[in-house]
Amino acid sequence: MTICLLAICLVCSGLLAGVYALTAEPIAAAAAAKNEAAIKEVLPETAVTIEEERTVDYEGASYAYNLAYDEQGNTVGCAINVSPVGFGGPIVIKVGFDANGVICNTKVLSQAETPGLGAKCVEPAFSEQFKGFDPSQKNLAVKKDGGDVDAITASTITSRAYTDGLALAAKVFQAIGQTPILLNDTPVIPSEVEESK
């Protein structure tokens, strides 16, 4: 009996390992394609060259970002990943900024919010309000908290998490150093800024 159970466990383990080996690469490729599509979706239309992903440390955490350039090599935007915690867990959001720190677009990469409630954060009815949102001119918080953002009905926790994530992305954008650099109309890569300090 023990030998039979051991044999069944070995066969099942072998099958599981085989399935993982067959699916790991396609799953990784699909995730990379989804990330690349999200980057293009959130950046300004003038972006023709997108830099490889980098990371920046901000307040003890590391954030992934991609800089984007136009045909002349001028920095036109930045896509930043943030993961605020909503009602159902982390909401992974890619936030695109133009060179002046204005939000171009947002894209939810993954979320586990309640279907029919918080999961509405992926719908354009909620996310479209962030296009053209300037965090330096408007309050990036839900109206219930005195901000300028319309919350999802019956999903205040998700709405707060989403707006908190975007506010964090705006701070990370400033930490990368884009706003002060680009206001001088001088495209500079962040690593060059660090070397000159």
Give the positions of each predicted feature.
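Flexible, solvent-exposed loop/hinge segments and secondary-structure transition points
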Residues: 1-197
